[in-house]
Amino acid sequence: MRWAVLGGGHWGTALAVYLLRQRHMVQLWGRRAERLPCQPGRTDLFPVFPECARPEGLHCTVDLAAAVQGGEGIVLAVPSHALRGLLTHLLPCLPSTALFVLASKGLEVPSALRLDQVLREILPEAPLVVLSGPSFAHDLMLGKPLAMTAASTDPTYAQRVAEAFGSAQMRVYTSDDVAGVCLGGAIKNVLAIAAGISDGLGNGDSARAALITRGMAELHRLGTALGGRTETFMGLAGAGDLILTSCSDLSRNRRVGLGLGSGLSLEAVLRGIGEEAEGVRTAQALFQLAQSLGVDMPITEQVYRVLFEGAAPRAASDELMRRALRSELHVSDDGTPGGAARTE
């Protein structure tokens, strides 16, 4: 297939190189030429992967129309806040039959829309598959095995992406739960910040395990309230991605939490990371959704308070530990397991 990968960061570059290794034709697009990993005269993937050799046949461009011309598939790998603008600019030059693969994670702020919903507002009829799961660009670049989920309301599109991306390195499962796969990939980033804060405070491995487990309860409560399915949240796009992002220092969201828990300001942490950490923006949208839907999300609420209200990380951690005691399998007044309705 002929693919256009839109997004010249680590994830977009890794996906472009991976597709090239699977013998697809690939154009990699980015907004700024100096940030694209195809610098003239260089044989590596500077600046995103300077330690990796540039594969023969990888083409880079800042011309959006040229990138998608003749494309059979378009991979979207841009930050959540850039997606709407990119799609709007894409409209005049869009190939009529292109299959979209949404590989970005997050929620739009301030609308709190899922990213597939953003795409549907602009391209309501476009064939769409959401590709998500526990995966780091670094692992993909180094040829390490991983598994992902390809979700679409049309099973033929999901199968087409599974076949295009699937290999001995990447196992791709299919799903029809687009909402659940999108939400799992977004919510886990905020919970990973919480895990990082806990570790930055020195709370230990036991506390991290508790946060991940109770974070899964929050992911399930909000995710099902927004139309996702339980089995999705227990799978690769939910629990799998949450575990990876919460436990590995390759995770930018975890590193945000580590910095905050160690006493750094948010500005200093983000400056040190130097790249987008989707969980920061997503925390705003999740807090907004939880409040409007009456969903109990105490971990998310404390992350929001640390990020945007100046709450001290230690005080936020202590607040979680001092919550009123209740059954782990709490059922709310509306009969929803886990307390879908807010309970004080």
Curated annotation (Swiss-Prot):
One of its GO terms (cellular component) is cytosol. It comes from the Bacteria. Sn-glycerol 3-phosphate binds at K105, G133, S135, K188, D241, S251, R252, N253. Its EC number is 1.1.1.94. It catalyses: sn-glycerol 3-phosphate + NAD(+) = dihydroxyacetone phosphate + NADH + H(+); sn-glycerol 3-phosphate + NADP(+) = dihydroxyacetone phosphate + NADPH + H(+). Catalyzes the reduction of the glycolytic intermediate dihydroxyacetone phosphate (DHAP) to sn-glycerol 3-phosphate (G3P), the key precursor for phospholipid synthesis. InterPro entries: 6-PGluconate_DH-like_C_sf, 6PGD_dom2, G3P_DH_NAD-dep, G3P_DH_NAD-dep_C, G3P_DH_NAD-dep_N, NAD(P)-bd_dom_sf. This is Glycerol-3-phosphate dehydrogenase [NAD(P)+]. The gene is gpsA.
